[in-house]
Amino acid sequence: DYTTRGYEVSFSSDDLVFFCFPVYGGRLPTPMYDRMSYVHGNGAKAVLVAVYGNRAVEDALLEMSDLCLNRGFKVVGGAEMIAPHSIDKRFGAGRPDAPDIAALNKFLSSLMAKQELTPVAMPGKRPYKEYKGIPVYPTSSSKCSGCGTCAQECPTEAIDPGDPQHTDKSKCIS
């Protein structure tokens, strides 16, 4: 959760943890590294879900796996899930749909059917694809009332609550 900051979470080797990460340009958003620095796997098993806007996951599952392994998790599964694109909702509109949900249920059933969850390798390449961002940032218009809802909802605090007309492009992950 991007909006939860600064508290430690520890798991044990008896735990099975599901991580759902957003994918931007085939990569994890950099704030995920900070958030994960507070998470301690201690041998817990991890299932990774890369959520992307109908473009491509590219190296994201491998990057997620490396991040989780470095935090003490054993990666035992991974899946790609399509959702509406975060900027242009026409891409991935109506997703996940019934076939997507069926595929996810099949994946979950296969995990549950295993006698023992063992580590698996995730697809992707090292070094990861370079992510240069996209030159699109939230902006306000004459319709902006200055209510600050956008600043409250922004997961990376890129929009200044005192001046919601301003977006810090260095923090924005859009």
Task: Describe the function of each predicted region.
Residues 140, 145-174:
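Iron-sulfur cluster-binding cysteine motifs and their immediate structural context
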Residues 1-133:
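FMN-binding flavodoxin-like domain, especially the glycine-rich phosphate-binding loop
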Residues 132-135, 147:
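Short gly/pro-enriched beta-turn/loop segments at secondary-structure junctions
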